[in-house]
């Protein structure tokens, strides 16, 4: 009897569930708590030309939260210094101007050695082009915790590309 050895190499994708953030109120957000739900993550800034997208993101949240969609906004000052000076100011700005009800993290570093590991993971999983170059990059995570799509700042949350 002849045994033929077959070997296949494949890459096992890492999931988003390894990451944690701090909420805008200082509470820990464990992404593993959202296993089995799709997650839409957006890096945001309060004083950006794309800030109007907060309204579209909130609309998306209201439309799909009943289906389990989790939306997380990640304020950052890394692109053009366009974020407010404190978490409290960001929280108030979002509440007053956009009536935000989705999850917001604390102001978070994205770029450089001190950048949040989530964004290094995005680059590893989807390549250099997926790494945020500006505010309001968007990342869609499937129910298994895998990054399935990303969108640049110019893609509005209510675009047919995202729905």
Name every feature range the model reports, one short phrase each:
Residues 23, 43-47:
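Amphipathic alpha-helical repeat scaffolds
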